[in-house]
């Protein structure tokens, strides 16, 4: 779940296990998130947060997804600057006072590869202002891009949010195909194992952090 108010973003996620045997996996990501948040304060290396997530996951019998990460958040930038890893591998950067971060452990079973891969299904899209050369677009394409930039200001969106723009559906598909509109693929665990996610957005201070989601 994401919220954007005048460009200020909060990002959060929960996993609900519909199958009872998957509840331990869902709970493990919640515990890993809680332990990571306890360690978040100005000056802490981001690699330390990743190590905490990994050690917590392993202690509970699960494995973190190594190629999914948390991230810094800035105004109108959901993924900005610093990366918050979910494993203990070297990763540059330290948490900065006053900065906003989304920390989000993704976990899978020990049978999993510990990484996700892309599928062909794409349901989330984004137009990055300033990177689309409007003068190279035809009239309806240019109009659609301008509408998307004005409405979402570079933030991700899904098709159900633009049902009022159905007359542009064909142009949208064409702009996705030629790369002027970026499309995010649906991700799955490489070996087909289940994945859980827990996420909060925090503001980092000198002596800790405040959860705002």
Question: What does each model-identified segment do?
Answer:
Residues 1-213:
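Active-site neighborhoods and metal-handling regions in enzymes and metal-associated proteins
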């Amino acid at each position: 779940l994401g919220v954007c108010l005048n460009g200020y973003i909060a990002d959060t996620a929960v996993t609900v296990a519909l199958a009872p045997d998957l509840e331990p996996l869902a709970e493990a990501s919640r515990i890993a998130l809680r332990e990571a948040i306890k360690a978040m304060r100005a000056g802490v290396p981001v690699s330390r947060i990743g190590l905490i997530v990994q050690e917590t996951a392993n202690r509970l019998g699960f494995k973190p997804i190594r190629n999914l990460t948390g991230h810094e958040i800035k105004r109108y930038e959901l993924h900005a600057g610093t990366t918050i890893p979910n494993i203990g591998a070297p990763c540059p950067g330290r948490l900065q006072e006053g900065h906003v971060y989304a920390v989000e452990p993704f976990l899978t079973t020990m049978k999993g590869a510990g990484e996700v891969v892309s599928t062909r299904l794409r349901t989330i899209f984004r137009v990055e202002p300033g990177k689309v050369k409007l003068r190279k677009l035809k009239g309806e394409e240019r109009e659609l891009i301008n509408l998307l930039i004005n409405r979402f200001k570079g933030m991700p969106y899904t098709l159900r949010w633009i049902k009022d723009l159905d007359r542009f559906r064909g142009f949208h598909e064409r702009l996705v195909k030629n790369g002027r509109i970026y499309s995010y693929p649906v991700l799955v665990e490489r070996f087909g194992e289940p994945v859980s996610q827990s996420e909060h957005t925090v503001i980092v201070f000198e002596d800790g952090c405040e959860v705002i989601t």
